[in-house]
Amino acid sequence: MMSDMEELGGRFVRDVVMKGTNANIMNAMQRCVLALYTYDDNPEDISPENVLRQSLELIAKLPEIAVYSYHAYRHFRKDDTLFIRNPQKGLSLAENILLMLRPDGKYTELEAKVLDIALILHAEHGGGNNSTFTTHVVTSSGTDTYSSTAASIGSLKGPRHGGANLKVQNMFADLKSHVDQDHWDNEDEIITYLKKVLNKEAFDHAGLIYGMGHAVYTLSDPREVILKRFAQALAEEKGMTEEFELYNRVENIAGKLIMEHRKLFKNVCAKVWTSTVDLYTACLVFRKNYYSDLCYCTYAGLECSPLGRTD
């Protein structure tokens, strides 16, 4: 059923996605979602049945919008080659994302499985996070599905929410510039760098080790535990076990450092935005570093869906 809802149509891609490209893909997705309102024959109907239809269509179309917006950004802003590949019926959302994203359209079964699991776990993340709560607040006014979804994508973009995973990736890139690859197994050098981060002497000088700490979970984030296992298998498939071990080492060290620095008496665990999840997905599933711009955009359609209005 979902595969029948995926295609945007050439007119929409040409007239909306490819024109007026944004510097940020999340803003491009907001614009495209609002434009879908004009392609809906019944956009204002907020009955449960119609909202369900609209939400399913958005979930099916947003990965395509994200990938196409990314390609438009790379072409018009970075002068890269532009290629557009249509989704194939019968493939999962994750498989179509990888098919449309990569120049050769190739991916392994494990890559698709890891991305599929990541999409599902993000979609199942309850209704209490910032973007989902935004959906509840905006829909309570009686507005249309497209307006509420666009608002939620705006929330997800923020660096204290979905945008935090880009901070994680940038932080690890900065760490690698300070700790040579030959020393990735040297805990003392990693500790020195992380202490500088906490003391606002390194990275973005915010004093935060991104990807660590959760408002509810202390011992572990169950989503992170699940995805970490698959990320390790993917690292082995791609010959990146050394990098996986670096991320794992930082995770093990950072929690203790944060507890000491802030004088906390509760455990600090890695959360689902940490390197052990989204950074692995970005580096291993998406392969190229510049795909990191797209990483959290792929979750937007699932996390921001206004299905909660039908509760």
Residue ranges of predicted features:
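Hydrophobic alpha-helical bundle cores within soluble ligand-binding/oligomerization subdomains
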Residues: 1-311
